[in-house]
């Protein structure tokens, strides 16, 4: 409040700016692809940051394994890709969220 009055115009301007930055971050995420791997590279899959699998490769040697082994390695590759997406998403949103006064370096992993 300035001089006892609430500055709605300033608040709306800041909200619009934050909304635009968040939309920009989401648009950037839509273009990102990550590759999850497991079994020393025997399973590789590529996903968008929106969790859509766009490619999967299985090493021919893996096909000699049991169904359970193959399923476990596919799950592990999916989990690997999801963890990468989560990290990237958090970084992008923190960057956009810095408008709230947060310091994005406070949450970086070392």
Curated annotation (Swiss-Prot):
Molecular function in Gene Ontology: DNA binding
Q: Which UniProt keywords apply?
A: Cytoplasm, DNA-binding
- Indicate whether Ribonucleoprotein appears among the record's keywords: no
Q: Where in the cell is it found?
A: Cytoplasm, Nucleoid
Main localization category: cytoplasm
Entry GO CC: bacterial nucleoid; cytosol
Give yes or no: UniProt keyword Cell cycle: no
- Describe its assembly: Homodimer.
Which family does the record claim for this protein? Belongs to the YbaB/EbfC family.
- Note the PANTHER family from the entry: NUCLEOID-ASSOCIATED PROTEIN YBAB
Outline what the protein does. Answer: Binds to DNA and alters its conformation. May be involved in regulation of gene expression, nucleoid organization and DNA protection.
Extract the NCBIfam families matched here.
DNA_YbaB_EbfC
Under which name does UniProt file this protein? Answer: Nucleoid-associated protein CBU_0656
